[in-house]
């Protein structure tokens, strides 16, 4: 009996309906949805749209992103509650059929496993920066190996452990983030920075094809709505445990609002306050002119991790861990459900969800080795447009 219960916990109803007796309220589900979007990548997207469009235009784009994502989330919430299935399994049983569901699993799986890979890379470079490690195979095996084991161990035990992990880390994230925001605004410029206009010069914007306020709005919306809609799809993976459509919709809307407005704004404000110091640091450490350092500041989410560590030291490093670790557990969880549906739909192969937890991490590591992570951001924006 004990082995049967353990197997059931690990399998976590991956390819079946979640029983009514295991359903949870909006708060429990919110720990997972909010945990997914409180990450360095979302903070980076926020900084990018604020620097390109300015805070006011970015907020308008965020409002539209919130509306679109919430509408999609409401529809998926209702379906998830009534069916009790994950998002890709829903497409197989109630929409696209077996082949269509397999295609949906490939599309969604590339995005979610891609984020698993991207955020692994962010954590890796954060470890290198904080501990002053060399980027060699020893460091890669140690850091990537340790992280992969941690994600598998925390994801293997199903919804309950995933939710508890996310709740603890989300509370810690917001506590440390509040301290960091106050500290960086105090050091970097204070309240005068809150509603800044675009920071990039006209020449840089023109090279990006952005020549008007409409272009700025479109750029900001495309970058924000992709993660918002991806989060709406994730709603089914966690919402299948919801007690009602209202509970699941509330959990999704809280998270999408945080992603499209709050975390976006915080990312912009933090990087605006930190920009002068970061430009000086980049120019000094890389031996490049200040103008070039300013352009490099927003070329990669690495800048967010470096900013936190430079300004916050141990607290900044802790914030990076809290932001990324919970998201990795949640990404791994959704990835395992998606891949389980893919293999069941195509090959009728059901080795158990744990096998797909491991496979998702293997694919993420392969993405890192293949250096294809730049496709993930483009894919996110493309999904937003579609």
What are these regions (language model features)?
Residues 1-59, 177-180, 187, 207-221, ...:
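Membrane-interface "cap" regions at the ends of multi-pass membrane proteins
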């Amino acid at each position: 009996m004990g082995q049967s219960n353990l197997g059931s916990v690990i399998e976590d109803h991956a390819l079946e309906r979640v029983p009514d007796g295991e359903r949870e309220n909006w708060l429990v589900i919110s720990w997972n949805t909010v945990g997914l979007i409180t990450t360095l990548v979302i903070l980076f997207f926020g900084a990018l749209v604020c620097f390109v469009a300015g805070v006011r235009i970015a907020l308008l784009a965020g409002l539209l992103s919130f509306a679109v994502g919430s509408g999609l989330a409401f529809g998926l919430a209702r379906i998830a509650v009534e069916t009790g299935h994950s998002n890709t399994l829903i497409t197989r049983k109630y929409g696209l059929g077996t082949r269509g569901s397999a295609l949906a699993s490939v599309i969604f799986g590339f995005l979610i496993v891609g984020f698993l890979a991207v955020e692994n890379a962010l954590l890796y470079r954060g470890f290198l920066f904080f501990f002053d490690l060399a980027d060699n195979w020893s460091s890669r095996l140690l850091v990537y190996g340790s992280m992969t084991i941690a994600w598998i161990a925390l994801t293997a035990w199903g919804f309950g452990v995933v939710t508890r992990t996310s709740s603890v880390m989300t509370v810690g994230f917001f506590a440390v983030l509040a301290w960091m925001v106050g500290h960086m605004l105090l050091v970097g410029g204070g309240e005068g920075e809150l509603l800044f206009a675009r920071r990039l010069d006209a020449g840089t914007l023109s090279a990006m094809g952005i020549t008007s306020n409409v272009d700025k709005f479109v750029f900001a919306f495309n970058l924000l709505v992709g993660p918002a809609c991806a989060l709406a799809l994730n709603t089914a993976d966690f919402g299948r445990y919801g007690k009602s459509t209202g509970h699941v919709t509330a959990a999704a809307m809280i998270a999408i609002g945080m992603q499209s407005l709050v975390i976006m704004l915080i990312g912009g404000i933090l990087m605006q306050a930190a920009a002068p110091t970061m430009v000086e640091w980049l120019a000094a450490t890389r031996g490049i002119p200040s103008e070039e350092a300013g352009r490099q500041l927003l070329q990669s989410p690495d800048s967010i991790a470096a900013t936190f560590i430079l300004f916050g030291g141990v607290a900044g490093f802790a914030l990076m861990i809290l932001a990324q670790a919970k998201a990795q557990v949640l990404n791994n969880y959704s990835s395992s459900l998606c891949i389980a549906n893919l293999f069941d739909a195509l090959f009728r192969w059901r080795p158990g969800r744990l096998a797909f937890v491991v496979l998702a991490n293997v694919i993420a590591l392969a993405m890192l080795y293949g250096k294809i992570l730049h496709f993930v951001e483009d894919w996110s924006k493309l999904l937003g447009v579609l």
